[in-house]
């Protein structure tokens, strides 16, 4: 008797909605990590942001090409940062022209006023690496081009680690994230792989169990590695989303948070400096945490609405 072939579905699924949900998870990890609620949550959130950036950039470049590449990066990443950088200059008062310049441009060099914003120059390093490699191998067939881009980005990890010794300030932990952006690009390249439903479920279940086991090592007194922990937290979030449909109130909340993930990231460092004072001044730490979350969220929503309105007016 003939049996129908087993249905094969994409091994990895990450549409715009799921990406937004993961952005929501990433920024929540950052906020909870920076306030000491989730151990190494900040590292896990940054790793997840970088993986999503690599994934999204490669998908975008494959569909749109490299035309307008830098304009898109400036409009979506650097320009929103610049206006907040101006605010940082006035509020944080960095000393010296070099510190002001680093703050406005997003460079680190140990001089940037808001130390959490080392991420801006870090992500632009990867944008540059991707652009150069894609240009070099742009004339090759699509499949070979993908392989060369992947190999080139893995080689770019070397200068990334070297630059971490001085280009980004010591506390950034930039060495911990050297594989995250290339990993996101690799996931984008592999997104068309299809597998039987049972095999797909088994793959992601094994991935989730492996991540959970590693994250539990500190409970057993085993010292973990920062870069592995960051990527493991990000991997666990991705695996959960592949296995469990997120719906209802949780989905709506994460989508909402994900929509404002970038402005939240831009402002949380600014309010984090105030948070330390609030912890001392308020009767309980949870009150300071709540004030920090509320202030960051209010500033992010207001700023993003103003920026979007300005962007729409300039595009008209």
Regions found by a protein language model. Give the residues of each.
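Histidine-centered divalent metal-coordination motifs
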Residues: 34, 265-268
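Alpha-helical transmembrane segments and terminal signal-anchor/GPI-anchor hydrophobic tails
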Residues: 156-263, 270-292
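Transmembrane helices and adjacent periplasmic/lumenal helix-loop junctions
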Residues: 124, 267-270
């Amino acid at each position: 008797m003939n049996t129908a072939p087993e249905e094969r579905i994409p091994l990895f699924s990450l549409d715009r909605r799921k990406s937004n949900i993961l952005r929501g998870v990433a920024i929540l990890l950052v906020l909870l990590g920076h306030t000491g609620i989730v151990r190494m949550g900040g590292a896990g959130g940054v790793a997840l942001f970088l993986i999503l950036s690599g994934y999204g950039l490669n998908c975008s470049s494959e569909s749109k090409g490299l035309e307008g590449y830098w304009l898109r990066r400036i409009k979506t990443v650097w320009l929103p940062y610049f206006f907040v950088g101006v605010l940082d200059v006035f509020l944080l008062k960095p000393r010296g022209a070099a510190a002001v310049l680093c703050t406005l441009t997003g460079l680190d060099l140990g001089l940037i006023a808001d130390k959490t914003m080392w991420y801006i120059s870090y992500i632009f390093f990867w944008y540059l690496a991707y652009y150069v490699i894609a240009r070099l191998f742009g004339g090759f067939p699509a499949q070979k081009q993908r392989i060369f881009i992947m190999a080139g980005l893995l080689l770019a990890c070397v200068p990334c680690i070297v630059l971490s010794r001085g280009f980004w300030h010591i506390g950034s932990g930039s060495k911990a994230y050297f594989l995250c952006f290339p990993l996101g690009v690799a996931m984008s390249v592999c997104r068309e792989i299809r597998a039987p439903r049972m095999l797909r479920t088994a793959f992601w279940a094994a991935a989730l169990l492996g991540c959970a086991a590693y994250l539990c090592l500190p409970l057993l007194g085993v010292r973990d590695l920062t870069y592995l922990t960051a990527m493991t937290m990000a991997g666990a979030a991705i695996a959960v989303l592949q296995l469990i449909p997120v719906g209802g109130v949780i989905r709506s909340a994460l989508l909402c948070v994900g929509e404002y993930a970038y402005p939240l990231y831009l402002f949380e460092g600014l309010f984090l400096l105030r948070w330390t004072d609030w912890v001392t001044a308020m009767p309980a730490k949870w009150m300071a945490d709540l004030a920090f979350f509320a202030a960051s969220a209010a500033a992010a929503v207001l700023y993003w609405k103003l920026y979007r309105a300005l962007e729409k007016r300039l595009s008209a």
